């Protein structure tokens, strides 16, 4: 019989990417990681990375090395919206440019394999249903 007064143990879902645990994913080389990804990501990495994405990764490494353990690293600003999030970037803080401002994005494990631009919206969503000039002209004036 289970004791009714005992607190329930909470179980948290462990993150895994295509069956690979987070700990193994972070230690995995990029070539091995690309084999787990979809065709678009594999194609992007097989064609090679030029100096700009590698420069971003170097800046993220430097920002992480400059911080103490269990602290948030400094924000690294970038215009590279087409950069694919790799496991090495998990825990970093990136300022992604949306055409106007840099939106601060903390890289979480669920973001692996997605583009940075997906996390920094470039437009203001439309708000429908608000009274504007056209609908207010039928209001009686005092």
Curated annotation (Swiss-Prot):
InterPro entries xrefs: Ribosomal_uS19, Ribosomal_uS19_CS, Ribosomal_uS19_euk/arc, Ribosomal_uS19_SF
Respond yes or no to whether keyword Ribonucleoprotein is given for this record.
yes
| Transmembrane stretches, start-end | none
Keywords, A to Z, come to:
Cytoplasm, Ribonucleoprotein, Ribosomal protein
GO biological process entries: ribosomal small subunit assembly; ribosomal subunit export from nucleus; translation
Which PROSITE patterns would you find in this protein's record? RIBOSOMAL_S19
Which molecular function term from Gene Ontology is one that the record holds? RNA binding
Is Ribosomal protein a UniProt keyword of this protein? yes
Which GO cellular component does the record give, naming just one?
A: cytosolic small ribosomal subunit
Its principal location?
cytoplasm
Per UniProt, subcellular location reads as:
Cytoplasm
Name the protein family: Belongs to the universal ribosomal protein uS19 family.
Assembly with partners or alone: Component of the small ribosomal subunit. Mature ribosomes consist of a small (40S) and a large (60S) subunit. The 40S subunit contains about 32 different proteins and 1 molecule of RNA (18S). The 60S subunit contains 45 different proteins and 3 molecules of RNA (25S, 5.8S and 5S).
Instruction: Note the HAMAP family from the entry.
Output: Ribosomal_uS19 (MF_00531)
Give the protein's function: Component of the ribosome, a large ribonucleoprotein complex responsible for the synthesis of proteins in the cell. The small ribosomal subunit (SSU) binds messenger RNAs (mRNAs) and translates the encoded message by selecting cognate aminoacyl-transfer RNA (tRNA) molecules. The large subunit (LSU) contains the ribosomal catalytic site termed the peptidyl transferase center (PTC), which catalyzes the formation of peptide bonds, thereby polymerizing the amino acids delivered by tRNAs into a polypeptide chain.
What is the protein name given in its UniProt record?
Small ribosomal subunit protein uS19
Give the encoding gene's name: RPS15
